[in-house]
Design a protein with these regions (language model features):
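Short Cys/His-rich Zn2+-coordinating modules
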Residues: 30-46
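Short metal-coordination and nucleic-acid-contact micro-motifs, chiefly zinc-binding Cys/His arrays
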Residues: 49, 59, 73
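Short cysteine-rich clusters marking metal-coordination/redox-active sites
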Residues: 53-56
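Short Cys/His-rich local motifs and their 1-3 flanking residues in nucleic-acid-associated proteins
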Residues: 58-61, 65
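Short microdomains enriched in Cys/His and/or Lys/Arg
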Residues: 66-93
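Short, solvent-exposed amphipathic alpha-helical segments in soluble enzyme
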Residues: 93-99, 121-122, 147, 179-183
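S-adenosyl-L-methionine/SAH cofactor-binding core of RNA-modifying enzymes
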Residues: 101-174
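C-terminal folded domains that constitute the principal catalytic or ligand-binding module
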Residues: 162, 171-270
Length: 270
């Protein structure tokens, strides 16, 4: 399954079942729709009976579609996602596709690969990097930094960075890395951030494990695209505030630090 890059909008229409469907949905949204179409039973997430906005996955009172930022970027993102990852309301690959127009999303399978993914990896405009810890690969493939943006444009035929993110649990990501031979020829970008993860929607026993959106922000920072990195971080924080407000049944602070950081990056809300 795959979804090509695209920008989703805040508007939606209602399906015959009464569930909203995003208009001009982005890559992860389209992958979710494709995955649901082949599912033998409905995917029931926590709070699924609340009636979620199809474009931001939050209940109407907490909808953030009007706040959604979009930042022009030179780099792109290719998400290779575990089987049900796109179905999870807390998935943060979705947030990357919100912000970065050049985002692709593909479902992973051990025995098959989407031809569209192979076409993307072979596209001469892109220089793909598999983002994964360098401890799991031979040193000759590992990079810990990227050339400055101006050097990237001058070298490698002006190729644009394409960050390949393996989106799933840590065990799923390791399996995807080991059992995807089409990734074996690609350089591996190994991140070594000084900070620890601030992700609050799922638990991890390792503070150095970052959620997918945090990893993307680190990649854009390495690529010299600081505004994209900061916007991804702020958008994750706003989404997290709204998501936890619903889960914990707490009042929502529309003037929180996260909202103010996002507004400073994107301008006044409409």
């Amino acid at each position: 399954m795959s979804a090509a890059p695209g920008r989703s909008q805040a508007s939606s229409h209602r399906s015959p079942q009464g569930e909203g469907t995003p208009v001009n949905a982005h890559a992860v949204s389209r992958l979710r729709t494709a995955r649901l179409a082949v599912s033998s039973k409905p995917y029931v997430a926590r709070g699924s009976g609340l009636g979620r906005c199809p474009s931001c996955r939050l209940v109407a009172s907490h909808c953030i579609c009007a706040l959604r930022p979009q930042v022009p970027t030179r780099a792109g993102v290719c998400l290779i996602m575990g089987d049900i990852e796109a179905l999870k309301p807390s998935n943060t690959g979705w947030l990357i596709a919100d912000v970065v127009a050049d985002t692709w999303a593909f479902g992973w399978a051990r025995t098959a690969v989407d031809p569209a993914l192979l076409t993307l990896l072979a596209d001469p405009q892109w220089q793909p990097y598999v983002v994964f810890p360098g401890d799991y690969v031979e040193p000759g493939r590992v990079l810990t930094a990227l050339p400055p943006a101006e050097d990237q444009e001058a070298g490698q035929g002006g190729k644009r960075p394409l960050f390949i993110l393996l989106d799933g649990t840590w065990s799923e990501a390791r399996k995807m890395f080991r059992k995807s031979p089409y990734l074996d020829r690609l350089p591996v970008l190994s991140l070594h951030p000084e900070q620890v993860s601030n992700y609050r929607l799922r638990r991890s026993t390792h503070e150095h494990h970052f959620c997918t959106s945090e990893v993307a922000a680190l990649c854009f920072e390495l690529a010299g695209e600081q505004r994209a990195a900061d916007t991804l971080a702020a958008w994750l924080d706003v989404f997290t505030d709204h998501y936890l407000s619903i889960r914990q049944q707490l009042p929502l602070d529309w003037q929180s630090d996260a909202h103010q950081r996002l507004q400073a990056l994107t301008g006044p809300a409409p």
